[in-house]
A protein has these predicted regions:
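C-terminal nucleotide
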Residues: 1-108
Length: 108
């Protein structure tokens, strides 16, 4: 979509958020990153035959489920689903933070 962003307020009310770094190094050259990117691109291309979308992020979970059969390759379907669901999870997380619903945020 875009590189636009917004800040979401956090009211913890005694809750704590733990942020960790596994320190695991990833190489985009030797990893399967390029394969996953190509599979995601194929999922988008297939979905565009039945949906008027520019990115996988244009779909809701429900829209993806309604049109997922347009993605012929099972692995590409899995990659597309991951992209759509993670985007929706982020949207839900921001909504939960704006509503001071730290419990829902934590479950996401």
């Amino acid at each position: 979509n875009t590189l636009d962003f917004e800040y979401a307020p956090i009211v913890l009310d005694g809750a704590k958020i733990v942020v960790t770094n596994s320190m695991v190094k990833h190489s985009l050259v030797t990893s399967a990153y390029n394969d996953r990117r190509n599979e995601s691109a194929q999922a988008l291309k297939d979905l565009q035959t039945v949906c008027d979308i520019k990115t996988l992020g244009d779909l809701t979970d429900e829209e993806f489920e309604a049109h997922k059969d347009a993605i012929k390759d099972e692995v590409a379907r899995k990659r597309g689903k991951h992209a759509v669901y993670e985007n929706q999870r982020t949207i839900k997380a921001v909504k939960a933070l704006k509503e001071n619903d730290i419990e829902t945020f934590g479950k996401l």
